[in-house]
Amino acid sequence: MQFPVEIWLRGDNHATTETIAPVARDARVWTDADVVAVLEGMLRALERAKNPDAAADRSVALRGFSWIVSPFESGGVVIALELTLGAVVAGPFDVPESLLTAAIARVIDAQRATTGSIH
């Protein structure tokens, strides 16, 4: 499944658009692994915008950013991530906001549980 991501780098006056395809399935049937792939794809797109030579398979941790699933004006929902580096918004996706919000919370919590805490 291909979808657009809008990327804004902090300090820039404009956003850019890129199309990514991290998963094959439609959003309504995403598994937790698909949700992880979507979030990682969004973070990698943001990294490529800042560092075009960044490795495509660079490891990604699902922490250190704020996120929200929001309704899109023409239907569906978008996923927005914000980091110190900038922000990236993907979608729209035809899936209930509550389901996608729960899936993102679940995969972020699961990764946090496996990586431990840093003090």
Regions found by a protein language model. Name each.
Residues M1-H119:
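Positively charged, low-complexity terminal tracts
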